[in-house]
Amino acid sequence: FMRPDVLISYLFPHVEMEWFIQGYAIFEILLGGGLLYYWLHRKGFSDFTSFACGFFYLSANCFFQAHRQIMFVNYLPFLLLAFLCLDRIFEHQEQDVYHIRPHIGLILSLFFCILHSFYFFPSCFLACILYISHLLPEHLKNVPARMQKKRKCKIWWNYIVDVSFAVSMNLFLLLPTGLSILGNKKDTGDSTSLLKILGVNPTLDSILYSPYGCGLTLFCLYALFLCIREKKTRKLAIAVFVLLFFDIFYWILNATLYVRPKCLIPFLPLILYLAAQALEGLRQKKIRHSLPLALLCAIPVIVQLIFLLHNQQIRHLVTADLVLLLVCASLGVFLEEKEITIPVSCWWINLGGLVLLLAIPSMLYLTKGQEEHYATIADESRDYFSREDLEACC
């Protein structure tokens, strides 16, 4: 009730609330895509790579929730702002001096993450930890060896201070919400079995296709595997893959309520950052294609086709996604072995590459949206209170 769209709506009592909620949701999706492009471009990625990953963001199936369960995705622009603030913190610190002090930009970014969706803040908090861990080694290279341990401790303490400020500023929301949850425990059915908690997710719907996960396509999983091979991105890529694959992390990040991959949506920006690393490396010939890794990506797709996906249109698109990846990986391996170089500066080659990368994600996004059965104004099945109850109270 303290979100910006809700507060602004109080100033316009004659405008229906649906316009504010829908307009703000669309604005946040577009803002997130723009911020992701800006973040990647600022980190030195090419226009091609930044645009492609920005489009991956906009076409991620998790944004299906922007009209249904808005708290699943409405914090993402502020998480991207937090990553931008972390970049600035590491860029502008003097190499011989580091003072522990609050970073206003990071505090405000995390504050709005909590304000929009406190349930997903533990995942946002962990995503920032992974990003800091990724940035630290490069930062410490410019710090004298005798000061590196002290500098590392100061950076982590500074992050804890910033998070503490953000949480404290949200206590007006967190305290009553926490007391309400404790005072009104909801029966969620049978408790989650230990076998399920300690299991794995062979479908990888935490990253692939599902609107209750990140909802990305197969190239992003392939890029994740390629980044595991590279020393610079290996630790971050392994950490992200472990979170995506092992059910116990779903359970922990869902506050031990259930084992569902929706808690991993906050890692979408990090996955796209790794996708940008892989795509840029492939275009610059710094990373080589791998047909075995492409074949490894086929396993979760086949499992999903057998057990999860029943819509024929989606099955065809997912199959096309797999075939396209295998063809591109095979062609890439062939060109590398023959030492044939494709000029990436040609506009028509870049255009063709964008079409190959973005066609399947956009079609999957539109097809997934067509599965929704939208509630009509006359449908009162979701109303907790009937119209008569509301009239009696008012």
Language-model regions: role of each:
Residues 1-4, 154-265, 307-317, 383:
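Periplasmic/ER-lumenal interhelical loops and adjacent helix-loop junctions
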Residues 236-245, 252-387:
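Contiguous transmembrane helix-bundle modules in multi-pass membrane proteins
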Residues 32-40, 78-90, 126-134, 220-224, ...:
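Transmembrane alpha-helical segments
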Residues 94-98, 138-155, 340-343:
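Membrane-interfacial, low-structure loops and terminal tails that flank and connect transmembrane helices
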Residues 22-28, 72-75, 123-124, 206-215, ...:
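Alpha-helical transmembrane segments of polytopic membrane proteins
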Residues 29-43, 47-93, 98-137, 158-178, ...:
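Membrane-embedded helix bundles of polyisoprenyl
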Residues 1-33, 55-77, 181-186, 194-210:
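Membrane-interface coil-to-helix junctions
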Residues 390-394:
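Short periplasmic/luminal acceptor-recognition loop of GT-C membrane glycosyltransferases, typified by
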